[in-house]
Amino acid sequence: MIEIRQLSKIFSSSGSRRVAVNKIDLSIGKGEFFALLGPNGAGKTTTISILSTILKPTSGEVKVDGLNVVDSPHLVRQKIGIIFQDPSLDDRLSALENMEFHGRLYGLSRPQRMVQSEALLKMVDLWERRQDLVRTFSGGMRRRLEIARGLMHHPKLLILDEPTIGLDPKTRRTIWEYIHLSRKQWGMTVFLTTHYLEEADSADRVGVMDEGRLVAVDTPEKLKKMVGPEVIVLQTDPDNLEPIQNYLEKFFGIVDCHVDSEGEISFPLPIGEEGAIGIIRKLPGTIRAMTIRKPDLDDVFIQMTGKNMA
């Protein structure tokens, strides 16, 4: 469904150059749910802006369903739906009018628009509010309407740019129920950018992006196995964090530590060592508490980039 080859995007301004996307290669199959994970500034939004024909690449090639995004942008747009990170609804129109306008842009006939609007607004529990102005909607309701609108023309590819940012956990779960239902019904490909680990965890595959580079692509489980079987989390004094990091690097070769200013440090348990207790007994300073957990995608990002997601 998506073929990306040596994609680069460079922004130039006042004599300076910024490489937003740096020679990435990626293939995504039809019906696949792919998540692109990374912090702000990693290049995620630039990548989907090229994918959705909003931006042109500096170099490389991108195809959607066999169509080149530079050569055939209008045809590509017919095949994609996109939910932007920032709101894009017209709040002076009603929910139904927003759906109607979107359907007209995609050339749907009046009967098609009527059928699709009713089915999708019912799916996202907004049919009873269809005549209300969008300006009266809560943030969660607006997000649900944006999803319904993005599905109006039954796209082959749904692009989601941080679709649940700023929403409460309950609303986020509801949004994803709608997305997964639509994907199952229509065999749609989903391309998600997010920094919510639990959203990326439900994808078929995850790409880890940092500073414009795609540093890893695999299933969530395989990526987490690269970290190791377990992660140790320690609570200590904040001024003891650096000595512990230095000790771990010097004697165990551990450089992939996650540290916060409150005195918490986490790191993968070295394979072949005598266990967590044996390591902790050798560490400098006072250890106030210890827990052991399975690796998550944040640990993957730290190992791949040497940095925290935040």
Model-assigned labels for residue ranges:
Residues 232-304:
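Short, charged/small-residue-rich alpha-helical element at the C-terminal edge
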Residues 173-186:
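Helical segment within the ABC ATPase nucleotide-binding domain
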Residues 1-4, 9-23, 30, 73:
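A short, flexible loop at the N-terminus of ABC-type nucleotide-binding domains that lies
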Residues 100, 104, 111-129:
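Conserved ABC ATPase "signature" region
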